[in-house]
């Protein structure tokens, strides 16, 4: 697993107009600029994990602030913007079916390109950036697991209980409006998903089909895996859950997919930070498997 990479997909969410997040939507574009400049947590953690970072703008609503890209510490920015953020899912589908497919294809094509690069690709971590995306992830989780919306909806960026209840009501309204059918994963994704989530679906499918292990970051990345596994159930065996976040829906989705997290540290940052931590542990496990002597080969006596 020498060729390690982390893909961070970015996109905005129209549902933020309903007051479901503690942060303004412009934070998405600002954080993408930070990823490229090398100042974010994922930049630091990816270097520690020996992984290169690629940032995919598939649906950021605002222009990325100009800054100074750092070719050493920063991530490489790839722009494949399908649209400037999703629509408000409480009023209309988050995106059209064709837009969902285009975002999936953007993630798929990027992973294919990463595989073809001289550096290659042996292990892929996936994460995201998008204010409002825990709302979309909770909606997807409710549809595919059948769990009540309240059970899969947490505090996201740190909202209080009053706003969390508002978030639950917003998701319930969106699901009542669209009545998404879990037998139609693309339709569900288009109705209540996100552009960056769709891109991660494509990335997960492309890597898994190529037999490349995929390390899922947190709740949103795992929600993307839900969609990917609904499309191709065999994909689950190629995924590794990096951690279990504080979001209640994350635990339920991991159980639904039959995944056990590598670590359980109450992480809630996003941006693939947990995936970077887990990649280091996965690499250590592979090194042990490949390089550590057995008692027999080392001439060590067994139990008396």
Q: Which residue stretches match the model-derived regions?
A:
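N-terminal loops that bind phosphate or other acidic moieties
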Residues: 1-304
């Amino acid at each position: 697993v020498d060729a390690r990479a982390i893909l961070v997909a970015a996109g905005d969410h129209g549902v933020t107009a309903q007051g479901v997040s503690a942060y303004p939507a412009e934070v998405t574009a600002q954080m993408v600029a930070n990823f490229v400049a090398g100042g974010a947590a994922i930049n630091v953690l990816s270097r520690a994990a020996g992984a290169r970072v690629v940032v995919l703008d598939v649906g950021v609503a605002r222009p990325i602030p100009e800054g100074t890209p750092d070719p050493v510490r920063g991530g490489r920015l790839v722009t494949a913007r399908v649209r400037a953020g999703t629509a408000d899912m409480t009023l209309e589908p988050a995106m059209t079916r064709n837009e969902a497919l285009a975002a999936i294809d953007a993630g798929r094509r990027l992973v294919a390109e990463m595989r073809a690069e001289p550096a290659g690709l042996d292990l892929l971590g996936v994460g995201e950036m998008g204010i409002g995306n825990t709302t979309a992830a909770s909606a997807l989780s409710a549809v595919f697991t059948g769990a009540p919306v309240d059970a899969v909806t947490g505090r996201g960026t740190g909202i209080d209980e009053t706003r969390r209840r508002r978030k639950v009501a917003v998701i319930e309204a969106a699901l009542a409006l669209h009545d998404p059918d879990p037998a139609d994963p693309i339709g569900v994704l288009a109705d209540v998903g996100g552009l960056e989530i769709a891109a991660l679906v494509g990335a997960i499918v492309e890597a898994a089909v190529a037999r490349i292990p995929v390390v899922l970051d947190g709740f949103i990345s795992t929600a993307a895996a839900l969609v990917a596994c609904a499309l191709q159930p065999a994909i689950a065996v190629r995924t590794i859950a990096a951690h279990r976040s504080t979001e209640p829906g994350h635990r339920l989705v991991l159980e639904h997919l039959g995944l056990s997290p590598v670590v359980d540290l109450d992480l809630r940052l996003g941006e693939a930070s947990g995936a970077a931590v887990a990649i280091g542990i996965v690499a250590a496990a592979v090194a042990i498997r490949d390089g550590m002597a057995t008692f027999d080969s080392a001439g060590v006596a067994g139990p008396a």
